[in-house]
Amino acid sequence: MKELSVLAKAYIFGTISIGLGLTIWMLTKLDWSNTGLYVLAALGAVAQTLKVEGPDDKTNYSIAWFVYGFAFIGFGPVSALFVVVVSHLVEWIWHKYPWYIQSFNIGAHGIPIFLAGLVFAAVSRGSRQLHGIGSV
């Protein structure tokens, strides 16, 4: 991390901080009794850890995104973030990346999941209102 510019370090730490705050806040709302959530977390961990490497060192193809999307649509953004965090922590243990890389990855996934949850809730709320108007 020493070789990074001050601006890059600020961006990384900002993303980690915002992601950590959102993760803590969202996971307080998690339904821990949902067994399907643990199955998805295990599938996500396997998919995240065993990604397909591309033609060069900087390219890989992760099928974990399908698991994250399914968790988001099926169980909501809080559950999707749980699956992302578990998947990335397992990958971190397996591949032993530097701490700031995986922390940044978790934060960089957490922020858009939170924002997508806000959009999804707004769109869903609007469609329920339209549905209610149509039934009158």
Protein language model features and the residues they cover:
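Short helix-perturbing small/polar motifs within transmembrane alpha-helices
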Residues: M1-N60, A64-V136
